[in-house]
Amino acid sequence: MKRKLFWICAVAMGMSAFPSFMTQATPATQPLINAEPAVAAQTEQNPQVGQVMPGVQGADAPVVAQNGPSRDVKLTFAQIAPPPGSMVLRGINPNGSIEFGMRSDEVVTKAMLNLEYTPSPSLLPVQSQLKVYLNDELMGVLPVTKEQLGKKTLAQMPINPLFITDFNRVRLEFVGHYQDVCENPASTTLWLDVGRSSGLDLTYQTLNVKNDLSHFPVPFFDPRDNRTNTLPMVFAGAPDVGLQQASAIVASWFGSRSGWRGQNFPVLYNQLPDRNAIVFATNDKRPDFLRDHPAVKAPVIEMINHPQNPYVKLLVVFGRDDKDLLQAAKGIAQGNILFRGESVVVNEVKPLLPRKPYDAPNWVRTDRPVTFGELKTYEEQLQSSGLEPAAINVSLNLPPDLYLMRSTGIDMDINYRYTMPPVKDSSRMDISLNNQFLQSFNLSSKQEANRLLLRIPVLQGLLDGKTDVSIPALKLGATNQLRFDFEYMNPMPGGSVDNCITFQPVQNHVVIGDDSTIDFSKYYHFIPMPDLRAFANAGFPFSRMADLSQTITVMPKTPNEAQMETLLNTVGFIGAQTGFPAINLTVTDDGSTIQGKDADIMIIGGIPDKLKDDKQIDLLVQATESWVKTPMRQTPFPGIVPDESDRAAETQSTLTSSGAMAAVIGFQSPYNDQRSVIALLADSPRGYEMLNDAVNDSGKRATMFGSVAVIRESGINSLRVGDVYYVGHLPWFERLWYALANHPILLAVLAVLAVLAAISVILLAWVLWRLLRIISRRRLNPDNE
């Protein structure tokens, strides 16, 4: 009886669940992300599998607000694919990919992949094809037809927006065949070239997100957005020194987050921005659009809607005075992990430990060996797979003043694992630094030749090796790329049609251990100055202290928007190099206060009167008039350091022009011989526009070197002119070697003299030793005299 009741209950429950199951199987109405009334999705009949029809979407687009603003974006492979932007897909390396992100306050409503490719004329039609994946979901297949062989082909592939997430990878997989039997996947006839003009057409729609600081820094900076972070800064009017310092802290923090993307901080005085922005306001001095906002009683950070556009957000930094704004800015830079709700009050930001020189988070540590695990920027960076595994790259950002001239090499202890080659052959690991080959190591095919054996069973087995490598130090700069290439001699099928040898190729796996180390702790800090290349590449000398605690910035009394923009862009750029905000930067508008200061000086707008007559200055820009000193001999390349006589100023030329010009100059501080001055000058609004563009553009910064960089409409020209001074410390013997390094004849003479002196010392010691033995013998045996 109990068994019957059990089965009756089971049948009843099954019947009740059946309608629910049927309901879930039908297309469901998509919910609106911004919580507005839902709109039922329009269903379409799915296209036939295998067909690629322009304009046909594989699934319904996400449902979003009808009145939300949208933007159309074209991302070409030249922008988002690995350099040079084009891809050559081959039989043994059939995959290529591009990556793009989607901001958290946007959604993609339409996506189309436009491909321009050329297939090899040797391919078999139809059997050869190009498969397109989005986040490992197959989007479609493009068969290679007879008419396409050897010709440039244009194709469109609709991308299903439902599969687009915060981070996306479009992968192209080439399936190539050139004969029916006995194929060699390494054949040079198996290729398909994808042009760099291929791209993605995306339509983004903005979402009306909630004012919630728990997501900060989103939407003011979104790490999913690969574009330059353009973030306007709004003031009621020309800011005073305290407000300049507060805004510089905020800009440098956003710069530290932007990193390689770049940053730009347009400045507005009492104007509404047209995009997400930062607004600085006090109870007494605020932009007109905040005139009705209640007064505050403490430093407050609040996220509000744009008065005219709810899709645009404003981060308002409020305070009773500039002191409050400074505290709020430090709260953004150091306390943002506690942000939540629409607003927060910054009660206190108390420093606990002072920063030390060269401790910038983005720089490789120079006080101890560093593991490769500390240098990783994403989880799988130190591993690779494939018949020909892709190169493993590690970035090394170093202080520009690291003295490496007499170094015999930098110790690097590498632990690596790799798939064992099936036979002893020429498979190897090549190590390169900045595209310069360093050393090569054979990949052993015998387990006993390696110290460790990985216990996890993998195809063909993984071997473990340990190698010490010495890096030639003179090849290092401020920014370096260390590359590991694993080159395998993969056995390939062969034979004839009647006697064909075939097998399934097996992928190779390579790993550089996280516990591998590199050691820069044994080197001095010493650099000849002025060197604008050190400033352009690493923000040096200001970045020596990551918090800019030993930097003084001299601003005009009443800076205009362009001058404020130069300040914010410069400290933002330095923050991007160091990875740390300028929380202890000093800003002044009185040039007389820098006298006697033990600090590096950044000048924006104009040289203070007391410095204009300094003989170290090699260029000056004042309104329409400018003058410059030119050297005896100019070197065209940044890496070539001229002799002191070649750098000597030969001529000073003064010109007057209505054309725009800007300049960056460097010279020794007259107040401390270990300190430097970097001045960013311009003669007009257009000049400041070119100056800011140069500061924000890494390509233009790369052309800056020497002591003078002149910025004109035609580009940037740099000069090495004037005296050289040295910053840092070397022991006396290293300093002597450095002084003689460029004088080989004198060095040879001194070397000969040193050898003669050594021989003389040895002879003198031998004579003294003989004399002492004679004296000792006579003292002990006076009868033998």
From Swiss-Prot:
An individual GO BP term: cellulose biosynthetic process
Keyword Signal: yes
Stretches in topological domain Periplasmic: 26-744
Subcellular location: Cell inner membrane
A GO cellular component annotation in the UniProt record: plasma membrane
Signal peptide location: 1-25
InterPro entries listed in its UniProt record: Cell_synth_B, Cell_synthase_bac
Stretches in topological domain Cytoplasmic: 766-785
Family: Belongs to the AcsB/BcsB family.
NCBIfam families for the chain: PRK11114.1-1 (NF008323), PRK11114.1-3 (NF008325)
Subunit: Tightly associated with the cellulose synthase catalytic subunit.
Protein name per the record: Cyclic di-GMP-binding protein
Species of provenance: Escherichia coli O157:H7
Gene behind this protein: bcsB
